[in-house]
Amino acid sequence: MKTMAKMIGLVLGVALLVLAVPLWVYFPGHNFRTVEQGVFYGSRQMGPDALEAAIKKHKIKTVVNLRGTNPGKPWYDEEVAVCSRLGVAHEDFAWSKNRIPDPESLARFLDLMENGRKPFLAHCEGGTHRTGVAAASFLLLRGVGVEAARGQFGPFFNDAPI
């Protein structure tokens, strides 16, 4: 009977771990990445205090919002206000997490990566889909191979269409 209880405990422990890892990845504050030190960072949507701290810590000069222009939404208005107060450029791109960005928007993004004020902080809502596409596009622009670029999508998104 003790062996069966230990076995059940072990199975439940492993199941809990398997379920907890994805939640940890998506939990606020746990999705900030350095794509290229001093040049490009990616994250999930941050509140104003966390955004200000990240801007100051990494000396961010341009925040790239991949969620599109959303005046009137608190997260957007707070983000724009923080950037304005700190003298940081704020660029909006309306990218979908379900499809590849349209060619014009992708070209504008790549132009920003080449000619904009660095370092950049790109973000979407969760910091995975759209931010992964942005990070991978940046790395491909820098001449990094496709496999390394795919690494920006994490273990659950390796089938991303790049």
Where do the PLM segments sit?
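Cys-dependent protein tyrosine phosphatase-like superfamily
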Residues: 2-120, 136-162
